[in-house]
Amino acid sequence: MPSTVASIRDYSNIPKSKREEIANGPGLEDFIVKSPTSLNTLFIYYSNFSLPLPPWLKTTIPTSNSYNKLNKDLRNLKLHTVCEEARCPNIGECWGGESGTATATIMVLGDTCTRGCRFCSVKTARKPPPPDPDEPVNTAIALAQWGLDYVVLTSVDRDDLSDGGSNHFAETVKEIKKRNLSMLVETLTPDFRGDKAAIATVVNAGVDVYAHNVETVKNLQWLVRDPRANYEQSLEVLSYAKIVNPNLVTKTSIMLGLGETDESILQTMKDLRSIDVDCITLGQYMQPTRYHIKVKEYVTPAKFQHWEKVGNELGFAYTASGPLVRSSYKAGEFYLKNLVHKRNKTNGSD
């Protein structure tokens, strides 16, 4: 009698339609891992039990004039933000904080992702609508209206596009710089399937900070991220961006509260420093809907302070660590802007 594993690996009798479905990537049904060795782990992460929200994670409903204006401008120009799509808890503060300066992170390439990471609430499809050709110009117009000096551009994954959307990304950066050369641009990119040409296209467009998130520690990648993403590939993306432009500021982010150990967090931070990543942010994972991975632990503010200290000791130029910190949270704050200006002067471009 053939073993169960052998039967699972035999694709010769799978219908053509099913083989195409597998090749195109996972749908929601594929998130149910059927391996017997994974059942106990999956029960922990997908059970109906939810941890009560601690007081330090409760935020206010956004109602400021700055928030309302930014929201209206986005709708009029048909733009998307990761702040909304990912249900970020900081949207009220970033869009209309005490300073009155909007710091929304613009999401290009549409609002539909070709991947289905188990922590993310952005909608998914195997073949999303084509990118809006007017989006680069509309994004630049909106940013010029807001009068910002620092902006974060991010995107969904677009595995359906031959270049992963890198040229669209680059065009958006160029349109922004065309209207305001002094504006600092941070790009938070997907992994582009590890395509070095795509990474170089974005870097060479004139970005000031190149960010790509490893999201979680190595041993939890399979549980948290889409199967097409992996730890080593993310490290290679960050490493190659630095090879293309050694003076480029590189940045990444890790979510905590998914069941990671202190040892695995420390090793991840060491791995990132080994490839000269400059900036790191650490924040609490928040379950966006009941269909996503459950929170395993609400990490205390004191523990986040510990990791900020560790980051500084390891040599990161900038470490932001806190329960509500996200990869683009207060990205344009004073220290990071100064770091970028310093690198630009070293490169002779400031």
Curated annotation (Swiss-Prot):
Residues engaged in binding [4Fe-4S] cluster 1: 83, 88, 94, 328
Details of cofactor binding: Binds 2 [4Fe-4S] clusters per subunit. One cluster is coordinated with 3 cysteines and an exchangeable S-adenosyl-L-methionine.
Cited InterPro entries: Aldolase_TIM (IPR013785), Elp3/MiaA/NifB-like_rSAM (IPR006638), LIAS_N (IPR031691), Lipoyl_synth (IPR003698), rSAM (IPR007197)
Keywords associated with the record: 4Fe-4S, Iron, Iron-sulfur, Metal-binding, Mitochondrion, S-adenosyl-L-methionine, Transferase
GO molecular function: 4 iron, 4 sulfur cluster binding; lipoate synthase activity; metal ion binding
UniProt similarity note: Belongs to the radical SAM superfamily. Lipoyl synthase family.
Name assigned to this protein: Lipoyl synthase, mitochondrial
Native organism: Trichoplax adhaerens (Trichoplax reptans)
